[in-house]
């Protein structure tokens, strides 16, 4: 590889780091904040941000920058090839209508969960969740479902690379406590997270498995903690959620069989 090739690869890596600096928790940032989040020089970040603005992938008011919906184009090819969001969407829509609560599907990407399908009912979170929204896996019900299926070596690597920071006063930040919770998820087949990602938000998630039995995604239902108690989550939200996950799995398996036949 020539020196120019190395430079091009590094340039792409830095540009992607700038894009990843924006998230559902940090949708609008100044140049200084992006530089701090990425560890890149301010001059480098400035060039990338202005390039993103010029190409329509970001906007700015002169001080603050934010990504535009055009960035979704970067992931559409992957999502289309994945097929899973299209399969899951009608099931999420039906579940959301039945429960009058929001339902989502996520996959694990690095240390985050990424939303790939969603049926929104009442807005509970202060952050507007859309396709492509990312949250730290350790603090979400879907994230813990996905983490619970990782081989031990991969889980250890995740924990070594991830700072378990308190997002709310309820967030579990102990590695040992998180590991025990993941064992519980494996045993019971679902996960409830109570106000760890945002105060007032309670959610329950269960896995979506491929035909090989491995977890390929997680599906959840979220509700306002003041309106839906823990017992009600188990008794009223979990059974239809599990039925939805099973329906997605059946459709996913059918689609896979058609593609291979």
Show where each model-derived region lies.
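N-terminal helix-turn-helix
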Residues: 1-86, 93, 246, 250-254
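Short, structured helix-loop boundary elements
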Residues: 8-12, 68, 81, 85, ...
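Amphipathic alpha-helical effector-binding/dimerization core
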Residues: 64-162
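Short, basic/aromatic recognition patches
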Residues: 88-95, 159-205, 251
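Juxtadomain coupling helices with adjacent low-complexity linkers
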Residues: 181, 216-261
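Sensor-regulatory modules in signal-transduction proteins
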Residues: 208-211
């Amino acid at each position: 590889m020539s020196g120019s090739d190395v430079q091009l690869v590094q340039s792409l890596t830095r540009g992607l780091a700038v894009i990843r600096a924006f998230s559902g928790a940090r949708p609008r940032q100044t140049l200084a904040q992006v530089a701090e989040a990425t560890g890149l020089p301010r001059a480098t970040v400035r060039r990338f941000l202005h390039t993103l603005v010029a190409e329509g992938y970001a906007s700015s008011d002169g001080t603050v920058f934010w990504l535009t919906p055009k960035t979704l184009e970067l992931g559409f090819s992957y999502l289309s090839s994945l097929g899973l969001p299209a399969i899951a969407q009608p099931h999420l829509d039906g579940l959301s209508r039945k429960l009058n609560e929001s339902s989502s599907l996520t996959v694990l990407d690095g240390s985050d969960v990424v939303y790939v399908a969603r049926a929104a009912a009442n807005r509970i979170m202060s952050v507007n969740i859309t396709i492509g929204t990312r949250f730290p896996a350790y603090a979400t019900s879907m994230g813990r479902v996905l983490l619970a299926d990782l081989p031990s070596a991969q889980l250890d690597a995740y924990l070594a690379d991830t700072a378990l920071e308190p997002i709310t006063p309820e967030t579990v930040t102990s590695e040992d406590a998180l590991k025990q919770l993941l064992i519980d998820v494996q045993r019971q087949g679902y996960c409830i997270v109570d106000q760890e990602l945002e105060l007032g938000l309670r959610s329950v998630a269960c896995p979506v498995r491929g035909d090989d039995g491995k977890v390929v995604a997680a599906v959840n239902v979220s509700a306002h903690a003041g309106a839906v108690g823990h017992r009600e989550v188990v008794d009223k939200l979990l059974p239809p959620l599990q039925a939805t996950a099973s329906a997605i799995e059946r459709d996913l398996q059918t689609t896979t069989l058609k593609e291979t036949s």
